[in-house]
Amino acid sequence: MAKKTIRDIDWSGKRALVRVDFNVPLENGQITDDTRIRAALPTIRYLLEHGAAVILMSHLGRPKNKVVESMRLAPVVARLAELLPEAKAIKGTQATTGPAAEAAAQDLKPGEVLVLENTRFDPREEANDESMARELAKLGDVYVNDAFGSAHRAHASTEGVARFLPAVAGFLMEAELAALQGALENPTRPFVTIIGGAKISDKIGVIENLLGKVDALLIGGGMANTFLLAQGYEMGDSLVEPDSVPVAKDLLEKAASRGVRFMLPTDVVIADAFSADANRRVVSVGDIPPGWRVLDIGPETVRAYTEIITTAQTVIWNGPMGVFELAPFAEGTRAIAQAMANCPGMTIVGGGDSVAAVEQMGLADKIRHISTGGGASLELLEGRILPGVAALNDA
């Protein structure tokens, strides 16, 4: 469903109340990765250039409904000032709502930016309390949601406030929806998805929804072990979910009945311990000995998956192929990242480890769309409606 965007508003003299995702990693008060701040810059710049005063709000970390000094947004304000020299002023406040926030918002002039304090310091945020939503709405004239990464949460700053102001999408939100919904609703075929990660139980809804849409589904990571177990293979000491075996069998049957290629590893990298310096070897999935565990996909599987990916026209990848955090077992994930970069079609990567692999290998510019939202992109892949998106005005 198409939503209004910041292009649909005359911003001259208006205050834009913008929900961004500035949930950045901090170490000793220093930002270690400012990707999420940079991702919001196109929206902020557009608003400033079109005569708006810009009020930004975000959560940071999990302060559990109280003020936590180490989770204040002051480091974000400082970084934003470095990244946005064209702003007439960039101000911070230790208030999110109430008289101090209202006074700061009233004083804000076109071309200036105000960063409100961490929304999750207020217990009403995660409860989606109407009183907080109304107080936030007092601060601006139009609400902009550019926080796709929080769009699956119905909080006061992501969903509640949209009931009390005109509500539109920012550029990041627009790009995420266009890429993911476009791929799911109108893909150029062949349409392939690669799903990895540790557990089937986390991705049942995603796989079920995709089985009605894709031409091929490639499975890796720990979840592949449970599918292999469902097919009768001995999995040694591998991570498996015995309770999910019936679900795995059901998904395999559904794929077969719908003519979807459901690809599982044919060879794997096994180790005798969960450790980077463990003994390891490559075996066929039928030859996993007792006491050994699967920690990555093998080279034969990499070749088969690579061929499917590089000949596809639409590919979505979410989740690692192995224990990506241990270097000897990161090869499968890295190989899939390379295959994605070599695919000429529409390529979309989401999920922390998948994105990290692409970025570590310097391949980010070869991927058409890198999703900023882990949980939000998974819920879209499940076919769910995201509260933060549903709350925006229809185009």
From Swiss-Prot:
One of its GO terms (cellular component) is cytosol. The keyword Nucleotidyltransferase does not apply. Its main location: cytoplasm. Keywords: ATP-binding, Cytoplasm, Glycolysis, Kinase, Nucleotide-binding, Transferase. GO terms for biological process: gluconeogenesis; glycolytic process. ATP binds at residues 203, 325, 351-354. The keyword Oxidoreductase does not apply. Its EC number is 2.7.2.3. Monomer. This is Phosphoglycerate kinase. It comes from Roseiflexus sp. (strain RS-1). The lineage of its organism: Bacteria, Bacillati, Chloroflexota, Chloroflexia, Chloroflexales. The gene is pgk.
